[in-house]
């Protein structure tokens, strides 16, 4: 049934199109191009800021982009929606994270501001006793980004910030962050592969990927039932829940799978490509 009407298809990047430590497979890039050539609309829906999209996607023609976990929406090359955190909330949150000795980053629309500890660990030469492979991956990622700036350069009347990313190194801090931050943010933790490193996101309660795909459907003049979403983590929850068909990767969060309409193969197995084939969209 999926090939009978024009669909709007939304793809998360990390863990969905892109495996940790790998580039985007050529088969995935080809599939995205085929979907669009068949008359469907394709969108990227990512937690990343728009300035941090992978180079491998730059030659794939998109109909739109949902960036910063729903806080930044682009449609046919035009920015149609942006919302950011209040400067007071940012300053208050930074103080709490600093007191917790966390690594944290202010993800602006055009620049990313990194805390003092992030500068030492992610951009410097400091090696922690618990420098696990996941942390090494973060280091490699951030050292490739030219738009990183010391947090001291951020000012309340300067760069707008829609999202804060953080990393913790003590398990007891995970629940503490949820307790303190949940009043003002969607608090998203990613599955912990190691017991000494947790990374997460603080996203405005006024934004999520689900609300963003609803806005995109309205711009396209299609019903939400004609949307399909692919994701793997809890910042995809609202998108998977709201889409006409929500597809979760086999490598995805176990709780997210409980609300999925479909579960496809893992990102390493080109699950997106296989599911698009089963849906007769390519």
Segments from the language model and where they lie:
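Short, structured coil segments at secondary-structure junctions
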Residues: 60-61, 69, 100, 181-184, ...
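Short hydrophobic/aromatic-enriched beta-strand-loop microsegments
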Residues: 62-69, 187-189, 246-251, 264-266
